[in-house]
C-alpha cells in the first residue's frame, strides 16, 4: 500500500529526515523541537514521495497501531489480530494498523514483563515508523493487507490484553511445563476468570511454546489444563521465582481481562426428592397456585346454562 493511499483513507502521516530530525544513528527517535513532531505538517495525497525521508504514522482513536515487540506476539499476531489495513515495520511484521468502528480516547497501552516491553497498543499522542531507515542497514517497509473490516474498541482491547498476558507467560516460563501450568492456570482461576477464556489463553500459550518433538504435546497439555480447572484447588504465581514487580505486572493484566469477561460460575446440580417423601409431606397451600386453579373453574360454572324446567 502506498503512502498516498493511506493518506486518502484519512490516516495521519508525517515525514522526517533521518540524521537531521533524529539524534545520530537513532533514526526512529524524532527530536526536532521546532516544530515538535506532534506539530509536523501532515503528508497530503498529492505530495511527491521523498526517497531520503522517513515516513511515520500518527495513530489516533480511529486508527490504532498494534506494536508486536516480542517473538511470541509476532508468532500469535494473526490469531488475535487477523486482517488489518496494513502491516509495517522491520521485515514488514512488527506493526499492524486497524480501524476502530467506535473511536474511544486513549493514548498508549503497554504490557511489560520486568523491564522488557512485549506489546503496545498506540493511539493519539504516539508515532510509529512506516517506511524508511530504522538503523544504518535496517529499513521499515509497508505491506498492504486490504482488510477494511473495523474492530470495536472492546474487541481490540480484549485481543491486546489476552495476547499480552500470553507474552508475559512465555517470558516468565520456568521449570517443568506442567508445574508452570498449575501456577498460571490456578492464578487466573483464582481471579474468577471465565474458564473458557482461560482455555483459549492456554491453547494459544501452548501454540507459542509448541514442542513438535514431543508427541501429542498440545493434546496432553490441554488435558492438564482441564484437570487443573476441574480440581478447584488453585495454585498461584507467587510460587514461581518471579519478582514482586513481575507478579504485579501479570496480575494487573489478569484483572483487566476479568473486568471484560463474565465471571465463571460453577454449574448448580439439581436436588432430587423421592416420590414417597413428597407424598408423605404435608405441604402448606400456596394461595397464588390455588387461586390460579380455582378461578377458571368458577368462570366455567358461571357460564354453564341452567338445566331443568323453564
Regions found by a protein language model. Give the residues of each.
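Short boundary motifs at domain starts and secondary-structure transition points
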Residues: 57, 170-174, 291-292
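Conserved phosphate/metal-binding and DNA-contacting active-site motifs used
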Residues: 1-167
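Modules that initiate DNA replication and primer synthesis
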Residues: 93, 100-103, 134, 148-265
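The Walker A/P-loop phosphate-binding site
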Residues: 264-310
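Long, contiguous hydrophobic alpha-helical segments, chiefly transmembrane helices and signal peptides
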Residues: 65, 128-129, 185, 189, ...
Amino acid at each position: 500500500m502506498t503512502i498516498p493511499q493511506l493518506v486518502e483513507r484519512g490516516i495521519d502521516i508525517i515525514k522526517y529526515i533521518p540524521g537531521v530530525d533524529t539524534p545520530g544513528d537513532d533514526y526512529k527517535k524524532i527530536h526536532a523541537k521546532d516544530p515538535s513532531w506532534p506539530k509536523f505538517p501532515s503528508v497530503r495525497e498529492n505530495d511527491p514521495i521523498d526517497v531520503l525521508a522517513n515516513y511515520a504514522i500518527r495513530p489516533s482513536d480511529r486508527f490504532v497501531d498494534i506494536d508486536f515487540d516480542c517473538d511470541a506476539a509476532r508468532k500469535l499476531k494473526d490469531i488475535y489480530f487477523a486482517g488489518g489495513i496494513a502491516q509495517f515495520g522491520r521485515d514488514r511484521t512488527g506493526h499492524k494498523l486497524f480501524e476502530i468502528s467506535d473511536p474511544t480516547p486513549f493514548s498508549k497501552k503497554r504490557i511489560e514483563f520486568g523491564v522488557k516491553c512485549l506489546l503496545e497498543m498506540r493511539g493519539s499522542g504516539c508515532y510509529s515508523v512506516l517506511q524508511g531507515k530504522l538503523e544504518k542497514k535496517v529499513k521499515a517497509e509497508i505491506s498492504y493487507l486490504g482488510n477494511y473490516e473495523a474492530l470495536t474498541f472492546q474487541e481490540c482491547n480484549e485481543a491486546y490484553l489476552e495476547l499480552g498476558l500470553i507474552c508475559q507467560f512465555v517470558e516468565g516460563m520456568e521449570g517443568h511445563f506442567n508445574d508452570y501450568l498449575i501456577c498460571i492456570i490456578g492464578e487466573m482461576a483464582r481471579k474468577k476468570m471465565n474458564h473458557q477464556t482461560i482455555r483459549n489463553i492456554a491453547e494459544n500459550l501452548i501454540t507459542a511454546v509448541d514442542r513438535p518433538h514431543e508427541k501429542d504435546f498440545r493434546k496432553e497439555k490441554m488435558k492438564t489444563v482441564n484437570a487443573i480447572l476441574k480440581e478447584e484447588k488453585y495454585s498461584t504465581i507467587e510460587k514461581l521465582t518471579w519478582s514482586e514487580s513481575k507478579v504485579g505486572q501479570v496480575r494487573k493484566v489478569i484483572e483487566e481481562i476479568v473486568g471484560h469477561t463474565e465471571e465463571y460460575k460453577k454449574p448448580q446440580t439439581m436436588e432430587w426428592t423421592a416420590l414417597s417423601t413428597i407424598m408423605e409431606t404435608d405441604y402448606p397451600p400456596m394461595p397464588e397456585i390455588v387461586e390460579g386453579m380455582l378461578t377458571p373453574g368458577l368462570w366455567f360454572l358461571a357460564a354453564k346454562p341452567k338445566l331443568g324446567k323453564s
